[in-house]
Amino acid sequence: MTESDSDTVPTAGPIQDGPHQRLARMAGDWEGLYRLWFERDMLASESGQRGTLRAVLGGRFLLHEYTWEFDGRSYAGVALYGYHIDERRWECAWADSFHSGSSIMFSHTSGDADPAHFAVLGSYGDGQTPPGPRWGWRTEIEQADADHINITMTNISPDGEETRAVEVEYTRVRPVAGAA
């Protein structure tokens, strides 16, 4: 099997329609605006972000690799998005050289997910010794049209207070005509 064979969405079977086709439509090269908040309503940073989303493992998953900047330094991240057919839920594994340290955040929807709306919830520790209560982290992905994706990440305190943490506004990078 060639790499291209393994990265395409099948034309028959349980992943040819619905959520997996939704993921496949997001495949491509993207660039846009990255915004970061540490405190409610206090924008900490705004920079460019470049990312590539590509279908992997026969279209079962979407791999997102990206770079962004904060305070004059470059950072990178990777996420694997998928829809678990048997569990009827969205799932995500995410790591970022700024946000997650040496951990991988695993997130998923609880209960039956809306296959048309990617929204997952994970959690992380407070970094203290001894560990305190865990904080929630919700990731939502909206694709308004073929050329625009918005990714929103929300921080959720142990008390349930929600605060915007990250927003990415992507525009699809179209190949330049005549470029090799």
PLM regions and their residue ranges:
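Hydrophobic small-molecule pocket/channel-lining residues, especially in calycin-type beta-barrels
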Residues: 1-180
